Amino acid sequence: YLVFSHFHYDHIQGLPFNYEIFDPSNKVTICSGLVSAKELREVFVRAFQPMYFPIPLVDTLKNLKFVDFSTVQDDMTKLCTIETIELNHPGGAAGYVVEKNDKKVCCFLDHEYGQVDKVDNEMVRKATNCDLVIWDGMFLDEELPPKKGWGHSSIEQGVNFSDATNCKNLAIAHHSPARTDEQLKEHSNNLKRDKGF
């Protein structure tokens, strides 16, 4: 299963470079909590047509299957529960909450925290006492003001959110592409905590 939060290029452009999808024995089910299967298929048809990619990817690969998110939820019933949460991102984005037994993981990438109370409050409700929050750490707090409306959060907001919700572990992801490995190590050391970074 490939579950997409949204369809900005940084999230979809890697699909045709995963050569496993070209093996017809690999059945690839694609869904999103943001749009229907029909709309999702059309997104990928448009994104990977010959003007942007050498072959019409969706029509060429018969092993790609586009389904509604509810289909994946039904398929996963015996394994886990998975639900969506609306995120604040230009064009829309879906976060995901996955639960199995007494374990819960919340994935909140591509969200601009602190702008829409209703969304933020729902995130807090879902993440309270969870096992892992995967957080959008595109920016630092000091970088946020000129980036208002870009749909991303800061590393520090992730740490504060993690503390406020008493989640057990925090994974900061979706870092700025301009951030170097050395800078990421420095931020990790500066924010060292028992819950992880």
Each predicted region: which residue ranges?
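Binuclear metal-dependent hydrolase catalytic cores
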Residues: Y1-C106, D117, M123-V124, D181, ...
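Residue-level signal for short, function-critical loop segments
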Residues: L34, H111, S176
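Active-site glycine-centered loops adjacent to acidic/histidine catalytic or metal-binding residues
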Residues: H6, D110, H174
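Short, basic, glycine/proline-bearing loop/turn elements
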Residues: V105-D110, L144
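Cap/insert and terminal regions of metallo-dependent hydrolase folds
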Residues: Q115-F197
